[in-house]
Amino acid sequence: EFGLKPVKLIYDKQPSRFEIPTIAIFENNQLVGKITLMAVHGTETFINEIAEDFTGDEIYSSLRFATDLMRSRKSVEIGVGVITSIHIKKGKRILERVLQVLPRILTEYTNSEIDTIIIGKIAAVDLDVNFTEKEYNHIENLLNQDKTKFYSDKAKEILLKIGYRENNNGILYSISQM
């Protein structure tokens, strides 16, 4: 079973021409990495290419499971995809493995105290390890506004649907388990 300790989720509602959601990972208010999510098309080739970016049957199985899940629910638009690319700054690998679908964010972190996650369309579609200066400044601006929530109604709706709960401060907590 995996659980996620309380993590502050900030929603970026800034309009963007990019359709790829990105999670920015912060440790003590410092960017330590980002996770880029791509839509799942369900093809064997697509999944095989993704699996080659990682090692181990476990990750491969997780990606296959997530793809099957998305495929089986294609009549209901979930609006999220599978974690397919992991970009870590400074070469620090903080994700031990990848588990299924974005909103659960049920990933094991190794030796990291993650305190803030920004969910939103904040990143360009590329394979660069580092954020562009524009991306970084945009995220910094969001943090500096010192608000607990920047709602993307769709994102919030999805998170609540799969087991997150909101407290009085507008912070969503995961109560999901696997």
Predicted segments, located by residue:
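Non-catalytic substrate-recognition and accessory regions of acyl/acetyltransferase enzymes
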Residues: 1-90, 104, 108-178
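Conserved glycine-rich acetyl-CoA-binding loop
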Residues: 88-100
